[in-house]
Curated annotation (Swiss-Prot):
Name of the protein described by the UniProt record: Xanthine dehydrogenase/oxidase
Gene Ontology MF term list: 2 iron, 2 sulfur cluster binding; FAD binding; flavin adenine dinucleotide binding; iron ion binding; molybdopterin cofactor binding; xanthine dehydrogenase activity; xanthine oxidase activity
Keyword Nucleotide-binding: no
Intrachain S-S bonds: 534-991
Residue ranges of domain FAD-binding PCMH-type in the record: 229-412
Species, as recorded: Felis catus
Family: Belongs to the xanthine dehydrogenase family.
Length: 1331
């Protein structure tokens, strides 16, 4: 049968595709067929929003043009017939005019690495197309489906709030009495100049937006016909009528129905499922009908329309009729981002039959009715406990389809609630969901009907029938509560090895949810003055019934203005926007995978181990060779040079004979396209002989599996210190690992040049020189034949310092073997599986202290999980030991470090580099000292704090010790003591919600601890027109390094920044570079740039003297005509660096950065949920080179630390397989995760004489300040435990990091947790283990 032509529009241009493949996504088509690379691939599963576009179509059923955001990575092109697509390139450009959305995110400093920026721009643009004057709440809701790993979200929201009708930010101008900077503080604030000026923004003019394609509008009355698209493996049929759909299902009952592709797309990509025939019913009318018993929705109705319809119903119907609707709306509020809700259908959510569905428990509890049809039959069934007979199964026969669902009106005396608990509120998969309904006999509190339905408690949605049936005719009181809780605890049990783990937490949630429902109904009954044997609501319990509400935003950014008289062209100290921000916002900025494909380019896909430790018995590529476009398979046998690689020469480019982790690279397939490469890699068959594996730190300790050497720092007399101590506390702390989650995954393009072994590499790496060295070693050629080029990265955070070479060595080998350009960009799941992350740590400590709280002795044994190679683990452990004191002077101290060798992918550098782990351990035992002494934690911390001139435990003298200033300023500006009293009062008045405060300092050493890395070079070219091309050894990954280097050169040369340009970092301009890491890149590269500029200035000096009134261009031209070189190099090495572990002497650091943060949180003791109310930060960055960039780094680091300490959790199976391989299972902070009040102040008048222009490093030091959130949570848990008779140990308790909802809930011991204690059966393997 002949395939139809696919017709759609992209940015106003008509696209006719004669060979539409149903497996091709819109993202792939945009990037590879149309060359529109602004839309990014971040995850491939609709979880990050980097691929967001706007889709527009004429909706025949609503009789209007509709605009909605969508994930291009999930949208099949076949679903876009007669749809208009708008990408970031279609709304504005630096070459013409930026759209106001693009301009505002750029000028408000909302783009750092920029990889997420186009998607965020398109989410905001879509909102404005639908609502030109949105509310602040609508703006925040628009970004539920978008992630950013760099900015900390504040500048994005603050910039876009200028569009809001109810809260445009004045930018801190001080002209608005209601300014967020003037709210909720009595502390005197010296207003800074604003980071941006909203008055400079181009106004939004909705009349100037592109029109909907007239050709598509003319088709609105044309009858639709069935369409058929044929791909390599899949046929797509677009049904135009219900009868067509029924006939198609009758002909092929196994044909898969697809609407939004939000579930099927995931199954095809990540579960390797194939559906040869896909039928799309999206054109079939999806009527919304208001009937006598409820509102009926067609099964294809998008969830966004369901949400809008129910919101209208709640606003217009009597309150007693809308109880169920409110429950559905509460679930939809957190269901997913706009991109998913706009395309996902209500019927698809039901038929998917997910055991953790947000909506199915609600529909089941409400008694929703489903209309099911097939050819010649039609039936209506109630969605009850029988509808899901097994895992992912429904009662529908293969030939049947779901036609509609009717959500009922609630009745008088009927109450309904819906609940969900996940790791993160926005766009997260639930741990447990629930729908609960009760109907009372008229005028009484006697139960007539009770439905308690749950997701996440079985392999399907379940109804607690045994429990609920026993409550009929009982009264709504304390006795019923106890009976239901006891019944649920027995009926909804989970095996210790249940998939998803968190068994006690999930079981407890079933009771907690019912208790919330009980209180909510009790409250409503009380309002109605029903006293018929009804329980009474304790006022301290009332807050447990409140739904989550985020407080209005209040953000402050304070910094020191440049001195009066500073030249206007001197941009040092000014909040200059990131130089590439506008290009990033318009999609014009080029990242590695954005480079256009070469004519004969090939694609590579890695083949990795599925065993943690095993011998390789055989590799069979025969099936892979059958995949269309297959070229070759490469392995260790193809390496012409050395297969040995890695920082410690303990790795292999490709595993040979044996694998040592799941994800170990065995080989790679090379094909003509990315899709074919993926299929071919999956077809490679490897057989193994398993060997014993070591997965966890505890395993490694038990089996003495360590890398050498054991590290130790010791000072004072530990024996004497402990003997003199009044108290001694011992314990341990576990700190989980963290995934980098840079939005741009690892990417390499290798281009063989055809001469003398030359190879040109485009790589997303922080380490150009090591990449060059490793590739040269692998190919067996000198380093001078390998050119490595880096334009920019979409984030790095340490993850691209060494681990980028796992891709950048495989790709050039394929290019060498084939003689053709080869490209590889890892999928998100590959990247997370292969490249490692932050090291998990286990610390065992013993601390001795006096009754006054003064610590006199400390012993800490540190263990890190390094994985299967050493990589940078030794340096990371060294830094952990250097930071084991944090900010405290401990006279007698010993720290040891053991690096565990395990069968996990090698862990590596991550922002902070071991420092955060060392400091969190310090603050943990410090908090236990305070609790034991019965003293305020802030008093104990201050009492033990270093003073100016003190020596650290590694004998480095503290000079320029600004920490006390930071501490006092933070105490004052945060109103710590007053707010602590307010929190105590809140806790007295609320039983199930508790607040906590904490103030935490940080001291972070600045330098590579490997001395020779503290060097940098720069190259400056001055052209005859006066323009300057600047190159240095650092790479740009969003931290603003290139921007700061231009500012440094601008001041040094005394010319405007507009005359200076940085193109890229490359090994043929600046050789032998150090990695862009350790927060020192501005220090060392800035000084090298300065030195190069000074050389240029000295050469120009004679011409300036001859022509003092001349211009820069005049002097440059004169020098050129006099044959004076206008090119200069600069070089810098940090002086007086070097430390000996043997003698505990020398200086590992050039200087220290300091900061203090105070945070307040509120926890829900029943669910473990928490919200970050407020954070105040005071940070010493010296004399800031760029306050906007520095504040952005402070906020971004803090929010990344917030993820580390409260949210991000890696789950491994006992066999060493990573469960969390994407944004659906691994949660980083989202827009709603940040503190409602976020106040950052850069310490004034604190120049640093040891760095360029008196500045200080800023990238890593602020991250640890997020520990203030962790300890604020712990403070709130203490308040919960103190008031609960079920808790035996009130204040000393174990809280490992991260403080997830599971850990928070389990720590808030109460009558519900007591009912849900689950033993561990020896025969059961847990779903996940703590590595």
């Amino acid at each position: 049968m002949t395939a139809d032509e696919l017709v759609f529009f992209v940015n106003g241009k008509k696209v006719v595709e004669k060979n539409a493949d149903p497996e091709t996504t819109l993202l792939a088509y945009l990037r590879r067929k149309l060359g529109l690379s602004g839309t990014k691939l971040g995850c491939g599963e609709g979880g990050c929003g980097a691929c967001t576009v706007m889709l527009s179509k004429y909706d025949r059923f609503q009789n209007k043009i509709v605009h909605f955001s969508a994930n291009a990575c999930l949208a099949p092109i076949c679903s876009l017939h007669h749809v208009a697509v708008t990408t970031v390139e279609g709304i504005g450009s630096t070459k013409s005019r930026l759209h106001p959305v693009q301009e505002r995110i750029a000028k408000s400093h909302g783009s750092q690495c920029g990889f997420c920026t186009p998607g965020i721009v398109m989410s905001m643009y879509t909102l404005l197309r639908n609502q030109p004057e949105p509310t602040i709440e609508e703006i925040e809701d628009a970004f539920q489906g978008n992630l950013c790993r760099c900015t900390g979200y504040r500048p994005i929201l603050q910039g876009f709030r200028t569009f809001a009708r109810d809260g445009g930010c004045c930018g801190g101008s001080g002209n608005d009495l209601n300014c967020c900077m003037n709210q909720k503080t009595d502390h005197k604030i010296t207003l800074s100049p604003s980071l941006f000026n909203p008055e400079e923004f181009t106004p939004l003019d909705p009349t100037q937006e592109p029109i909907f394609p007239p050709e598509l509008l003319r088709l609105k009355d044309t009858p639709q016909k069935q369409l058929r698209f044929e791909g390599e493996r899949v046929t797509w049929i677009q049904a135009s009528t219900l009868q067509e759909l029924l006939d198609l299902k009758a002909q092929d009952p196994e044909a898969k129905l697809v609407v939004g592709n939000t579930e099927i797309g995931i199954e095809m990509k990540f579960k390797n499922m194939l559906f040869p025939k896909m039928v799309c019913p999206a054109w079939i009318p999806e009527p919304v009908e208001h009937g006598p018993e409820g509102i009926s929705f067609g099964a294809s109705c998008p969830l966004s329309l369901v949400e809008k319809t129910l919101l209208d119903a709640v606003a217009n119907l009597p309150a007693h009729q809308t109880e169920v609707f409110k429950g559905v709306l509460e679930q939809l509020r957190w269901f997913a981002g706009k991109q998913v809700k706009s395309v996902a259908s209500i019927g698809g959510n039901i038929i998917t039959a997910s055991p953790i569905s947000d909506l199915n428990p609600v529909f089941m509890a409400s008694g929703a009715k489903l209309t099911i049809v097939s050819t010649g039959t039609r039936r209506t069934v109630r969605m009850d406990h029988t509808f899901f007979p097994a895992y992912r199964k429904t009662l529908l026969a293969p030939e049947e389809i779901l036609l509609s669902i009717e959500i009922p009106y609630s009745r008088e005396g009927e109450y309904f609630s819906a609940f969900k608990q996940a790791s993160r509120r926005e766009d997260d998969i639930a741990k447990v969901t629930s729908g609960m309904r009760v109907l009372f006999n008229p005028g009484t509190a006697q139960v007539k009907e009770l439905a308690l339905c749950y997701g996440g408690m079985h392999d399907r949605t379940v109804s607690a029938l045994q429990t609920t049936r026993k409550q009929i005719s009982n009264f709504w009181n304390e006795e019923l509560l106890q009976n239901v809780c006891a019944g649920l605890a027995e009926e909804l049990s989970l095996a210790p090895d249940a998939p998803g783990g968190m068994v006690e937490f999930r079981r407890t949630l079933t009771l907690s949810f019912f208790f919330k429902f009980y209180l909510t109904v009790l409250q409503k009954l009380g309002i109605q003055n029903s006293k018929d044997k009804c329980g009474k609501l304790d006022p301290t319990h009332a807050s447990a019934t409140l739904l989550f509400q985020k407080d209005p935003p209040a953000n402050v950014q304070l910094f020191q203005e440049v001195p009066k008289g500073q030249c206007e062209e001197d941009m040092v100290g000014r909040p200059l926007p990131h130089l590439a921000a506008a290009m990033q916002a318009s999609g014009e900025a080029v990242y590695c995978d954005d480079i256009p494909r070469y004519e004969n380019e090939l694609s590579l896909r890695l083949v990795t181990s599925t065993r943690a430790h095993a011998k390789i018995k055989s590799i069979d590529t025969s099936e892979a060779q059958k995949v269309p476009g297959f070229v070759c398979f490469i392995s260790a046998d193809d390496v012409p040079g050395s297969n040995i690689t890695g920082i410690g020469n303990d790795e292999m480019v490709f595993a040979k004979d044996k694998v040592t982790c799941i994800g170990h690279i065995i080989g790679a397939v090379v094909t003509d396209t990315r899709e074919h490469a993926q299929r071919a890699a999956q077809a490679v068959r490897i057989t193994y002989e398993d060997l014993p594996a070591i997965i966890t730190i505890e395993d490694a300790i038990a089996k003495d599996s360590f890398y050498e050497p054991e590290l130790k720092i010791e000072k004072g007399n530990l024996t004497k210190g402990f003997s003199e101590a009044d108290n001694i506390v011992s314990g341990e702390l576990y700190i989980g690992g963290q995934e980098h989650f840079y939005l741009e995954t690892h990417c390499t393009i290798a281009v063989p040049k055809g001469e003398a072994g030359e190879m040109e590499l485009f790589v997303s790496t922080q380490n150009t020189t090591k990449t060059q060295s490793f590739v040269a070693n692998m190919l067996g050629v000198p380093a001078n034949r390998i050119l490595v080029r880096v334009k920019r990265m979409g984030g790095g955070f340490g993850g691209k310092e060494t681990r980028s070479t796992v891709v950048s060595t495989a790709v050039p080998l394929a290019a060498y073997k084939t003689g053709r350009p080869v490209r590889c960009m890892l999928d998100r799941d590959e990247d997370m599986l292969i490249t490692g992350g932050r090291h998990p740590f286990l610390a065992r400590y013993k601390v001795g202290f006096m009754k006054t709280g003064r610590v006199v002795a400390l012993k800490v044994e540190h263990y890190s999980n390094a994985g299967n190679t050493l990589d940078l683990s030794q340096s990371i452990m060294e830094r952990a030991l250097f930071h084991m004191d944090n900010c405290y002077n401990i006279p007698n101290i010993r720290g040891t470090g053991r690096i565990c060798k395990t069968n996990l992918p090698s862990n590596t550098a991550f922002r902070g580099f071991g420092g955060p782990q060392g400091m969190l351990i310090a603050e943990h035992w410090m908090s236990e000292v305070a609790v034991t002494c019965g003293l305020p934690a802030e008093e104990v911390r201050r009492k033990n704090m270093y003073k100016e001139g003190d020596l650290t435990h590694f004998n480095q003298k503290l000079e320029g010790f600004t920490l006390p200033r930071c501490w006092e300023e933070c105490l004052a500006s945060s109103q710590y003591h007053a707010r602590k009293r307010e929190a105590d009062k809140f806790n007295e008045e609320n039983c199930w919600k508790k607040r906590g405060l904490s103030i935490i300092p940080t001291k972070f050493g600045i330098s590579f601890t490997v001395p020779f890395l503290n060097q940098a070079g720069a190259l400056v070219h001055v052209y005859t027109d006066g323009s300057v091309l600047l190159t240095h050894g650092g790479t740009e990954m969003g931290q603003g390094l290139h921007t700061k280097m231009v500012q440094v050169a601008s001041r040094a040369l005394k010319i405007p920044t507009s005359k200076i340009y940085i193109s890229e970092t490359s090994t043929n301009t600046v050789p032998n570079t150090s990695p862009t890491a350790a927060s020192v890149s501005t220090d060392i590269n800035g000084q090298a740039v300065y030195e190069a500029c000074q050389t240029i200035l000295k050469r120009l000096e004679p011409f300036k003297k001859k022509n003092p009134s001349g211009s820069w261009e005049d002097w440059v031209t004169a020098a050129y005509l006099d044959a004076v070189s206008l090119s200069a190099t600069g070089f810098y090495k940090t002086p007086n660096i070097g430390y000996s572990f043997e003698t505990n002497s020398g200086n590992p650091f050039h200087y220290f950065s300091y900061g203090v943060a105070c945070s307040e949180v509120e926890i829900d003791c029943l669910t473990g949920d928490h919200k970050n109310l407020r954070t105040d930060i005071v940070m010493d960055v010296g004399s800031s080179l760029n306050p906007a960039i520095d504040i952005g780094q402070v906020e971004g680091a803090f929010v990344q630390g917030l993820g580390l300490f409260t949210l991000e959790e890696l789950h491994y199976s006992p066999e060493g397989s990573l469960h969390t391989r994407g944004p659906s299972t691994y949660k980083i902070p989202a827009f709603g995760s940040i503190p409602s009040e976020f106040r950052v102040s850069l310490l004034r008048d604190c120049p640093n004489k040891k760095a360029i222009y008196a500045s200080k490093a800023v990238g890593e030091p602020p991250l640890f300040l997020a520990a203030s959130i962790f300890f604020a949570i712990k403070d709130a848990i203490c308040a919960a435990r103190a008031g609960n008779p079920d808790c035996k140990t009130k204040k000393l308790f174990q809280l490992n990091s991260p403080a997830t909802p599971e850990k928070i809930r389990n720590a808030c011991v109460d009558q519900f947790t007591r009912l849900c204690v689950t033993g561990t059966a020896e025969s059961c393997k847990p779903w996940s283990v703590r590595v």
